[in-house]
Amino acid sequence: MKHSLTIIGAGLAGCEAAWQAARRGVSVTLHEMKPEKRSPAHHLPGLAELVCSNSLRGDSLENAVGLLKEELRRGGSLIMEAAEATRVPAGGALAVDRQLFSDYVTAKITAHPLINLVHGEMDAIPAEGTVIIASGPLTSDALAASLSGLTGDRLYFYDSIAPIVTADSLDREKVFAASRYGKGDGDDYLNCPLDREQYQAFVEQLNRGEKVAAREFEKLVHFEGCMPVEELAGRGEDTLRFGPMKPVGLTDPRTGIEPHAVIQLRAENREKTMYNLVGFQTKLTWPEQRRIFRTIPGLERAEFVRLGSMHRNTFINAPALLQPTQQLRSDPRIFFAGQITGVEGYVESAGSGFLAGITAARLLTGMPDPAVPPAETALGALVSHITNADVRHFQPMNVNYGLFPDLEGRIKKKERRGKLAERALASLSGWLERVSPPSRETGEPTGAEQVDLA
């Protein structure tokens, strides 16, 4: 067929990309290494396997991931269709039966006449044709070696994530803005000062905190520059304050003296609506992170948009390598999608695949523009972040309202998320009119919606 697309990886991103491209009349060859070869984390034989939790997180528009799900629903997402068809009771979250979910997606993909599913490992990137790489966080060694030829030293094999808090949840009476030795702009960093007693209590909490147990395939050899903060605390009382919590070159303007220790917060985006805890990569459990980090002066009411983690995760430095369309700058016939781009989470991976599939199809069928979604939408905010973030400090990110452009005018904090969601869905409507396939979707078989889950 004239318009053909190769997709490597049939997880959530790859399946969503294949579905969106096929809906637009593009012939897709979808490569999946299972069942011939499996990663240590995969157990089911089918496509779109949920490796960790069976939850796609909150469904409310008060959460950015809830908004992202609604945008995908309105865009005709296969992954959201499968989730709704296989959901199980989970309060305010959208959780699924993972076996039925995989079965549903597998049935839809294999039934589509424009999608050719090929089993077996792809150990190299095709030299010709349009390609979407959606090989996921556990990309095989052979494929990773091929990818390194495209990405150089900007392909990573584990993440080292520090928590991120919203700027408006910080207590500005306790934190102060300053860069070490007065270098840089005054508010490049915010600083949380600790006296000796506060520091000792904090170190003790880190030593006692509950840690996440690493699965066998996630056991890491930590480099000194990426050591979990709790491991540093365990080396001795003063290790942290001579490491990431060192106070040298910082003077608290309220006391006129150098604090005993300091936790620095660095702006995560240009708008400075989010700050990350510098050097605070951690393997503490999420409840422990919230509890312990809220004992830090100035963070007592911190709202966390991302919590820390360290685990096996193959991903690229997307802002250094990708265009806003998720195309490789050095070779635009190649797209990346899913967690390998640096998005974090099931729904985010599906969203990334959704966009890659649409854009690849538009380019292959000669549409006039790639139709990048508006930055006001969850889809647009997420892809804008991963392709425009600070190259020097890039780490995986899930969708959150801190990524969105500010609202105009003064909005009450409790109304902000609702207004952001309202604006997003209004922007989405016009965008979907441009990118949606014809009402009669090319090649989709009659009754394809019906999947027997018995």
Curated annotation (Swiss-Prot):
FAD binds at residues 9-14. The keyword Ubl conjugation does not apply. It comes from the Bacteria. The keyword Hydrolase does not apply. Keywords: Cytoplasm, FAD, Flavoprotein, Methyltransferase, NAD, NADP, Transferase, tRNA processing. Residues 432-454 are annotated as: Disordered. It is found in: Cytoplasm. It is an enzyme of class 2 (transferase). Its EC number is 2.1.1.74. It catalyses: uridine(54) in tRNA + (6R)-5,10-methylene-5,6,7,8-tetrahydrofolate + NADH + H(+) = 5-methyluridine(54) in tRNA + (6S)-5,6,7,8-tetrahydrofolate + NAD(+); uridine(54) in tRNA + (6R)-5,10-methylene-5,6,7,8-tetrahydrofolate + NADPH + H(+) = 5-methyluridine(54) in tRNA + (6S)-5,6,7,8-tetrahydrofolate + NADP(+). Its main location: cytoplasm. Gene3D superfamilies: FAD/NAD(P)-binding domain. GO terms for cellular component: cytosol. One of its GO terms (molecular function) is tRNA (uracil(54)-C5)-methyltransferase activity, 5,10-methylenetetrahydrofolate-dependent. NCBIfam families: gid_trmFO, PRK05335.1. Belongs to the MnmG family. TrmFO subfamily. This is Methylenetetrahydrofolate--tRNA-(uracil-5-)-methyltransferase TrmFO. The gene is trmFO.
